[in-house]
């Protein structure tokens, strides 16, 4: 496409010729590469105003403060949940506050013991704990001071006051027989 006009500047005519040739080459390549994915154009990077070091530091501080606040809320939520769990688990009145890992392990044992109780199973304590057949007894070796060490022995949360059992029998040591509960 040539423009020979006295009103059309010469330097634009050659530039337009170059553009026309590029377009033709592009069309030829597109027809040859029609099976290939189209080439993505790079995004333009616009220059943005440079921020001062003080502004950058303030932005970093704000981001860090927000992250710290999120982490603090997460930890408070976790601690509240663990405190609630400690309140549900049976414990001796003079027992010191359990650590997080002790609380989780004891909860695991307590759930397993309640499951055994619901299923009507009452495995022999020595057999279970010697063979480790329940899978949890071996995990409880670090918790020998807790009211129950094996899921083989369910622990009640509380006996109703109508029962004649003294409070000292509410908790059982590792190899004692599990109580039988009355059926309602």
From Swiss-Prot:
GO terms for cellular component: nucleus. Residues 62-114 form the bHLH domain. Residues 38-52, 172-184 have a biased composition (Basic residues). It is found in: Nucleus. Interacts with hlh-2; the interaction is direct. Residues 28-37 have a biased composition (Polar residues). The keyword Disulfide bond does not apply. Residues 1-55, 164-184 are annotated as: Disordered. This is Helix-loop-helix protein ngn-1. Acts as a transcriptional regulator. Regulates expression of various genes, including homeobox protein unc-42 and helix-loop-helix protein hlh-34. Required for embryonic viability, neuromuscular development, organization of the nerve ring and neuronal cell body location. Regulates AIY neuron axon morphology and cell fate. Plays a role in cell autonomously establishing a neuronal left-right asymmetry. Involved in regulating glial specification. One of its GO terms (biological process) is negative regulation of gliogenesis. Signal peptide: none annotated. It holds the Pfam family HLH. Keywords: DNA-binding, Nucleus, Transcription, Transcription regulation. InterPro entries: bHLH_dom (IPR011598), bHLH_transcription_factors (IPR050359), HLH_DNA-bd_sf (IPR036638). Gene3D superfamilies: Helix-loop-helix DNA-binding domain. SMART domains: HLH (SM00353). It comes from Caenorhabditis elegans. Residues 76-114 are annotated as: Helix-loop-helix motif. Residues 62-75 are annotated as: Basic motif. GO terms for molecular function: DNA-binding transcription factor activity, RNA polymerase II-specific; E-box binding; protein dimerization activity.
């Amino acid at each position: 496409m040539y423009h020979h006009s006295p009103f059309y500047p010469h330097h634009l005519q050659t530039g337009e010729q170059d553009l026309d040739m590029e377009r033709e080459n592009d069309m030829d390549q597109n027809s040859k590469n029609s099976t290939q994915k189209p080439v993505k154009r790079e995004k333009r990077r616009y220059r943005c105003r440079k921020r001062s070091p003080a502004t950058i530091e303030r932005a970093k501080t704000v981001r860090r403060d927000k992250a710290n606040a999120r982490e603090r809320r997460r930890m408070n939520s976790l601690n509240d949940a663990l405190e609630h769990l400690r309140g549900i688990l049976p414990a001796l009145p003079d027992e010191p506050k359990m650590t997080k890992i002790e609380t989780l392990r004891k909860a695991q044992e307590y759930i397993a013991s309640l499951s055994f109780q619901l299923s009507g199973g009452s495995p022999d304590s020595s057999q279970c704990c010697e063979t480790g057949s329940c899978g949890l007894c071996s995990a409880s070796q670090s918790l020998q001071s807790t009211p129950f060490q094996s899921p083989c022995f369910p622990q009640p949360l509380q006996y109703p006051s109508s029962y004649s059992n003294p409070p000292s029998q509410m908790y059982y040591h590792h190899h004692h027989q599990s109580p039988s509960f009355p059926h309602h």
